Amino acid sequence: MLLFQKTLSRVAAPISVAANLILILLIIFKSPAQMGNYKYLLIGLSIFEMSYAVLDVVSETTVLSIKKSFVVVVPYKDRSFGQETAMDINLIYCGFFGFSMGMFVVIFAYRSFLTTGNTILRKFEGFKIISWFAYPLFYAIVWILVAWGPLASFPEMDIVVRPFLLDELNMTVDEVAYTGRLFYSTIDNSLRYSAILTGVLQWVLTASSLFLVIFFGLRCYFHYGKLVQLTDVQSIRLRQLQNQLFLALVCQATVPLILMHIPVTILYTCCVLNIVFNPFSVATTIALFPAIDPLPTIFIVKNYRVALFEFVCPSCLCWSETLKHMGSNRITSYRSNTVNALSM
């Protein structure tokens, strides 16, 4: 199973890099003028996802469920770096997970402010939009500090982890760098409050990010309903673009929700209930996230989809346009014949 996970990561990483590079080029050269600074947020998201994919391959991270605990493991046995570097990679990996939670809040918030005409966006014109990344960076810092402090390895944890590392990875605690949460002490079965409190903190941040995504998403949705009443050509085009971007954003936000946040939430719950959760499902689904996430924007936004088809298969696009014109002519002819028949 570990071999499958490594293979999947090595396959998903180049797909992620290629897909996100394509999306970045499409955003730079094929974005409608109405997108404004929103395109910089999308570029930032693509850069983050490429970095996540590369980190996943470099780290070879594994998540092990160990009844009352779980551990994030970065092996350094027979590799070009030692324990200290492996621990740094482990912390960065945890930070990237936290960053992903805050990132979609920022994008949904920007779309909400943009569609409702909030004047606050005028303060972030041009490259000032980069300051919006401070919010997901805050999430990343919290996850890193929690992993570095309360979730760092300690002697009691080593005793718990040692047999599982040997069985699952054929490694010892001296050949890996790991972070993990031990909810119950193995000595007297008492609660470890440092693990509980930091778990509550991370749960609150996770729940708040989900709440904000839903809140800003609903604001966008209800405002789009008002755009339906506008009938001039420019407003119709704007409405179509806004709908495409919103649908793409919803799909993009659903991908990490299904592949990352729900599995990790289940993992936390299983640890509290002393249930072993499939150790490879979490790391495997996380590896898929950066490869799948850019696809909705590429194929839902018309400008990007058409530009990609023009490059990959120009003849296919020509046939599509021909069929579209043929269908349009038939409808026009049918309407004309119907009107003539009624007039007679």
Curated annotation (Swiss-Prot):
Q: SUPFAM superfamilies in the record, alphabetically? A: Family A G protein-coupled receptor-like
Q: Which domain of life is it from?
A: Eukaryota
Null mutant phenotype reads: Lack of sensitivity of ADL neurons to N,N-diethyl-meta-toluamide (DEET) with no effect on average pause length of worms following DEET exposure in contrast to wild-type worms which show a marked increase. Does not affect AWC neuron activity in response to DEET.
Instruction: Give TM segment ranges.
Output: 11-31, 40-60, 89-109, 129-149, 196-216, 257-277, 280-300
Bilayer disposition of the protein:
Multi-pass membrane protein
One GO molecular-function annotation for this sequence? G protein-coupled olfactory receptor activity
Which Pfam families is this protein grouped with?
7TM_GPCR_Str
Disulfide-linked positions: none
* Signal peptide positions (record): none
What residue ranges lie in the Cytoplasmic compartment?
32-39, 110-128, 217-256, 301-344
Q: Name one GO cellular component term.
A: plasma membrane
Q: Which residues lie on this side of the membrane: Extracellular?
A: 1-10, 61-88, 150-195, 278-279
Which of UniProt's keywords are assigned here?
Answer: Cell membrane, G-protein coupled receptor, Glycoprotein, Membrane, Receptor, Transducer, Transmembrane, Transmembrane helix
- InterPro entries named in the record: 7TM_GPCR_serpentine_rcpt_Str
Expression tissues: Expressed in the ADL chemosensory neurons.
Q: Where in the cell?
A: Cell membrane
What is the predominant subcellular site recorded for this chain?
Answer: membrane
Example GO BP: olfactory behavior
Give me the glycosylation sites of this protein.
N170
> Other remarks?
Mediates sensitivity to N,N-diethyl-meta-toluamide (DEET), the most widely used insect repellent worldwide.
Q: What does this protein do?
A: Probable G-protein coupled receptor.
Give the family per the record. Answer: Belongs to the nematode receptor-like protein str family.
Q: What is this protein called?
A: G-protein coupled receptor str-217
Q: Give the originating organism.
A: Caenorhabditis elegans
| Gene designation per UniProt | str-217
